[in-house]
């Protein structure tokens, strides 16, 4: 369906962009000197299709610590248009704040409109493949009234950290006269929707940004990755985990959240938390520990172990004891909650630390967390989501729960996290606790595979999402007793569905969709490291069981989704619009256009990448 247009798009990016590089160098000279730009000797055939008084051309200046400045215009020729942009940028009051003469400090972006077409307001959508589809980062939108146009450029999705059409309309309507009528966003959008005076135009653009002495062609405002390779994979693992390490606090916590667009640490889910008491999450903290351990496996660099110990000590500091039938248990208690997943992932992290280093100094807590997980398996095998929750039973331990309370506190993901920790303990020790862990673990696995789909069917989605359970089953099947057909089928069925619901090279609506997941074909793509941890677990399981053909299929799928996720990495080249690119570089974002980073956005991608790398490459590690 999309092969022809994608082949054409890829062919465009395979061109030699030397003329654009030279153009941007000359633009820089003209910005500095004020001398008129001359481009008569440059051949832009196949690169720029300039239409007289139709092709809008923007020039934007970016510099660390400065708000970008830009100007766009349309003139009779490409050269006249660029000279107008240069003239107006030089007149900007903030222009003197930019070191336009320094290619290492001030980056210049050239963006020009292509494929402009008029649509009706009713056609505008972000779901359907039709004349009015708006694709964030690919399409721009123009509102025109009384001969005046207001533009949202495709690259605005990156520079403004937007994700959907509503954010586009909110931004655009504010620039129109409607923006002065009311400060309420909903009222502005309502006025726009009822106004017959505005014409709507969809368009795409071509964009190039300087990087030192080079120019980089952008797609969806981002640097393009066109093929999978292990060097890129490895470098993104180490660099992103180093970013987590470099941004750790003295008490062992990680920097939880970073907004690259605004250079702030306040996360979108907790915007009202004071700056001196920002939200933190103990479960995702443990994911950061696992990422550090993966980096240590790949490098044998002791700096990661030093950081792991600090992070584990913080987790111990928020752990509380309680009694169980197997002895003293410990659970992670933070934000007034005792989450099954919080203790489960902590157990995973501590077990991984023990297995990789052989250091048994946390053994009291490993056993304590194991006992806690076992104590949260209900008599029918259901894993209870919370031990303490402030909204239930006055925040007291949830020992006796009725059916309504169990359902209200059930988590789709916590059981898989807890079962992975339990499996790691059961498979690596031979004491009575390990035997009990196996017994309880089997009961819980039977329930989650057979009963959860019946009781909690509403929690299942078209695109499988329980990667933790896939990893847990991979671990449990190392014990021959647990190689049950229904367990194994769960992993491979979900993995096959994930592979089916992945955009491929020739069926991708946009060329960077290749390797991205979707719920329904046509969805905006999901470059998802968390799900991919389940996919790579299926690869390891297939190899362990000797299913070579399936393993090869899974390996290729992992490579494909990894290449897609390469685009989430904030490289020096791609961080051009960030307020503080020195700080954001080496981190990994949530989404393609949103510029939010969280410790788990790094952890999931880096851990998926690490396991994929280790599946095919030799690496230094302490223990098998």
Language-model regions: role of each:
Residues 303, 322-335, 347, 351-362, ...:
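Domain-length accessory/inserted modules outside core catalytic folds
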Residues 214-283, 302, 307-310, 318-326, ...:
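Low-complexity, Ser/Thr/Pro/Gly-enriched N-terminal "stalk/linker" regions
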Residues 2-212:
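Basic nucleic-acid-binding interfaces
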Residues 369-449:
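Solenoidal tandem-repeat scaffolds enriched in leucines and small polar residues
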Residues 221-230, 286-302, 345-360, 417-433, ...:
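Well-ordered alpha-helical scaffold segments within catalytic/enzyme domains
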Residues 229, 267-286, 325-346, 359, ...:
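Solvent-exposed loop and edge beta-strand segments that line ligand/cofactor-binding
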Residues 280, 500-624:
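CBM-like carbohydrate-recognition segments
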Residues 23, 226-244, 300-318, 358-376, ...:
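Extended, well-ordered alpha-helical scaffold segments
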